[in-house]
Amino acid sequence: MLVALTFIWGCNWPLFPLAMRELSVWTFRAVSLSGGGLLLLTVARLRGIPLGVPRAHWGMLLIAAVCYLAVWNVASGFSAITIPSGQSAVLGFTMPLWVAVLSALFLGERLQTRNLLALALGAAGVLLLLLPGLQAYADAPLGFAAGILAGLGWAGGTVMLKRHPIPVPAIVSTGWQLLLSSMPVGVLAVALHAGPVFLPSTLTVVVVSYITMVPMAVGNLWWFSLAGQLPANVAGLSVIMVPVVAMISGALMRGEPLGPPQVAAMACCMGALALTILKPKPASAG
């Protein structure tokens, strides 16, 4: 699941500029969030899974949805169209660093030596990926800020749900979060729309449909399933390879930079991932 999620999300980033050639970031995200939410809730219903959420948990569900899904999706989308998509992915995936800080502050999760080393390797990988894009960030500071905001929003939503878990199946929780987060984004899409209503091109429809069904619906379902099973800081580090895949796919699909810094970053991120998911064997007695 983790390997598939890494490739689904990593290869998703170069598609953002294609999706937003004709649509605003607000319209694109409103469509993909609402479509992904409706798809998951429909599948849950067809499988006979109750869609209800206990009344006491609706507030937290809404707050987490806005922090992660609304802030992350809008900010990352804006960042991806103002700076190279691979560089945007790197900024968004500073998320594990923010999760480590927030989970220590609010969840009391202690970072073991392996986690600290993985975090250091992950930070080194992110730094190596950031360096080639410094000029792009200087030319588009709002894109840089939006990328960092995306990572913070994702981290905040993850920690909230770890502290206040929603007692429903992951497919139901994910579906409602996608649908709830689409509402404020949809309102802004309508309010900020300028110009005549038009029918998007076939390419735009295909790209947005794919993003809605696979990275948005399936990807988020898998992410919430993983996040529910792992400590917050480990869950965050588990997706550290996504920006590396985004860089490689951006280079292949859009001719974005790929050189020694990216290769070194890949080695750092692979080391961080190995430390995170591979547990040492217990010492044998005697």
Model-inferred region functions:
Residues 21-30, 53-59, 116, 131-156, ...:
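Juxtamembrane helix-entry segments on the extracytoplasmic side of multipass membrane proteins
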Residues 1-32, 36, 78, 136-163, ...:
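Glycine-/small-residue-enriched transmembrane alpha-helix faces in small-molecule transporters
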Residues 22-71, 98-102, 152-157, 174-193, ...:
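Transmembrane alpha-helices of multi-pass small-molecule transport proteins
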Residues 35, 40, 62, 94, ...:
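Hydrophobic transmembrane alpha-helices of multi-pass small-molecule transport proteins
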Residues 29-31, 69, 73, 88-94, ...:
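Helix-helix packing/entry segments at the starts of transmembrane helices
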Residues 56-64, 111-123, 143-144, 168-178:
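Cytoplasmic-side transmembrane-helix entry/capping segments in multi-pass membrane proteins
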